[in-house]
From Swiss-Prot:
GO BP terms, alphabetized: L-tryptophan biosynthetic process
Pathway participation: Amino-acid biosynthesis; L-tryptophan biosynthesis; L-tryptophan from chorismate: step 3/5
The protein's name: N-(5'-phosphoribosyl)anthranilate isomerase
Keyword Oxidoreductase belongs to the record: no
Length: 213
């Protein structure tokens, strides 16, 4: 199976085009005001129309309420929902039933104890994303450029695909895939020149490096 490549937190037409034209499988739009990559739904919808059917559109939320999810699904019509907060397995199951969309659930990792929740989420999610656990004083749960110890995933055996994220860039994506044996990678800050400012060339370089790994 080809490596799943997701570029998350896209905010401009040119960076989105760089992602889809270079072959990203998934493009992520963030709906979380604390993030420098946050979009309003109208602008995300305009970017989504640019995608057409060239990649899967992913709506990333953090403990979103039903009203926000209703608006995102109705207007953006995403292919995937990604939950990056403290959503419970029961919440994931309920939302899948309501919208009929696949869900990718992020699990924050700092130590082996963080993997204890994995069986419960693997039973309800369609994909798992392992990301670095943020510092306690962080205002957002991801996109911070921090990595976790990839060796913690040694021995993880899931029946569904999983992706890794956190501190990954074109220079280390091959190593991340080798160590974790993940089916895919998700990048945000690793293709930015400053928080929220993605660079088309960095996006292209990352996708090519992931494909070559």
């Amino acid at each position: 199976m080809s490596t799943i490549v997701k570029i998350c937190g896209l905010t401009t037409a040119d960076t989105l085009e760089a992602a889809v034209e270079t072959g990203a499988d998934m493009v992520g739009f963030v709906f979380f005001p604390a993030s420098p990559r946050h979009l309003d739904i109208d602008f995300a919808d305009a970017l989504g129309r640019q995608v057409r059917s060239r990649a899967a559109k992913v709506a990333l939320t953090v403990d979103a309420d039903d009203d926000l999810l209703d608006a995102i699904v109705e207007q953006l019509r995403p292919n995937w929902l990604q939950f990056h907060g403290s959503e419970s397995p029961e919440r994931v199951r309920s939302i899948k039933r309501i919208y009929g969309l696949p869900v990718m659930k992020a699990i924050a990792v700092a130590g082996p104890e963080d993997l204890s929740v994995l069986p419960d989420y693997a039973a309800v999610a369609d994909r798992i994303l392992f990301d670095a656990r943020p510092p306690k004083d962080a205002t957002r749960p991801g996109g911070l450029g921090a990595a976790f110890d990839w060796k913690l995933l040694d021995g993880v055996n899931l029946k569904l695909p999983f992706l890794v994220s956190g501190g990954i860039n074109a220079g280390n994506v091959a190593e991340a895939l080798r160590v974790t044996r993940a089916q895919g990678v998700d990048v945000s800050s690793g293709v930015e020149t400053s928080p929220g400012e993605k660079d088309p060339d960095l996006i292209r370089d990352f996708i090519r490096a992931a494909r070559a790994a």
